[in-house]
Amino acid sequence: MFLLPRFVLVSCIIGSLGFDNPPTNVVSHLNGDWFLFGDSRSDCNHVVTTNPRNYSYMDLNPALCGSGKISSKAGNSIFRSFHFTDFYNYTGEGQQIIFYEGVNFTPYHAFKCTTSGSNDIWMQNKGLFYTQVYKNMAVYRSLTFVNVPYVYNGSAQSTALCKSGSLVLNNPAYIAREANFGDYYYKVEADFYLSGCDEYIVPLCIFNGKFLSNTKYYDDSQYYFNKDTGVIYGLNSTETITTGFDFNCHYLVLPSGNYLAISNELLLTVPTKAICLNKRKDFTPVQVVDSRWNNARQSDNMTAVACQPPYCYFRNSTTNYVGVYDINHGDAGFTSILSGLLYDSPCFSQQGVFRYDNVSSVWPLYPYGRCPTAADINTPDVPICVYDPLPIILLGILLSVAVIIIVVLLLYFMVDNGTRLHDA
């Protein structure tokens, strides 16, 4: 009678010790409220136009093609669409956001604004851009692009100063020098307007170096002035180098309002596109899958640099990307990572996704959701789960009590039997 509860308790402990719930290297979701942004490796529409139709082109499981939870474009990326004429209007909304894109702007494309420019600066721009995107999509549900209207009162038009190969920069726009100016030592302005979104990601860029034109060197200077609040955002060139520099961009998160773009020297730049952020949500870390080429092409790690906890979880394969459709499409390792989108999972962490929320031999780092051996503790802005020792303490107390009872009963029966034998 006394042994039954202890037997059940010990059986439960043994069962839990034999249960394995390691973190898995996948991206997943808590429920159906999720969205994926991608490129050709998750572009179902692109596969439909191939002849013959071949879903091995993708790393995404074809079962998700009709989900309505994917915004992907072959040959493109959010960064590429943000800055260049090669544009796709990425649009999506969800509580849990996943990104699997970025490979379509890498050192392989070798983009730089001028022949003496630097692709390294553009890789830096890419990292800064995705840092803002990932941070903000941890607190916003909706992402899309919007055009930014501007008014310039001069007669000069925007110019394609910054271009390389098939890529032509059009965000921000360069306003050409007025015909009556003999050099670039002049001040010029343009009005632009942000409306319809909660917040916007816009570029503020300068040539950070000595820009040579007709034997004269110029220092770039660009400002945005919020005419409603009086806040000024600005960049001035600080480098003295004359070669090997390029277009340095900062990515500002701005509210709706009326703005003035100001140039004190060199060409005026004005934003023409913005990332539109809408519908604030409870903090939910985004998930990013490494987007890279087969080793035959040069890739970068800028999405990994941008994706940092607690706002972002980064997933990567441990092997070279080797596709089955071609070397850059249909890799088994990345297909495995995306397979987690086929099911719900209760817990996310820096190490991976936990399939069960009961116990695990691995301590979840930066956990989110219903995590193994954990309880939800809600802080004002960042819901996290932390270890709860109460169940283990209770088990220890019960085991201690059980041992004491067994010892007492054994002593009692030993003494009682000894007394009976002595009396006999």
Curated annotation (Swiss-Prot):
EC number annotated for this UniProt entry: 3.1.1.53
Spell out the molecular function terms from Gene Ontology: host cell surface receptor binding; sialate 4-O-acetylesterase activity; sialate 9-O-acetylesterase activity; sialate O-acetylesterase activity
Q: Give the highest taxon in the source lineage.
A: Viruses
Catalysed reaction equations from the record: N-acetyl-9-O-acetylneuraminate + H2O = N-acetylneuraminate + acetate + H(+); N-acetyl-4-O-acetylneuraminate + H2O = N-acetylneuraminate + acetate + H(+)
One Pfam family matching this protein: Hema_HEFG
Instruction: Give any Gene Ontology cellular component.
Output: host cell plasma membrane
Q: Kindly identify the residues recorded as the active site.
A: 40 (nucleophile), 326 (charge relay system), 329 (charge relay system)
Q: Which residues form the signal peptide?
A: 1-16
- Which GO biological process entries does UniProt record here? fusion of virus membrane with host plasma membrane
Give the span(s) annotated as Receptor binding: 128-266
- Give the sugar-modified residues: 54, 89, 153, 236, 301, 316, 358, 417
Segments carrying the region annotation (Esterase domain 1) are 7-127
Q: Where are the transmembrane segments?
A: 393-413
Write down the SUPFAM superfamilies for this protein, in alphabetical order: SGNH hydrolase, Viral protein domain
* Family as reported in the entry's similarity comment: Belongs to the influenza type C/coronaviruses hemagglutinin-esterase family.
Q: Which HAMAP family match?
A: BETA_CORONA_HE (MF_04207)
The protein's name is Hemagglutinin-esterase
Q: Tell me the organism.
A: Bovine coronavirus (strain OK-0514) (BCoV)
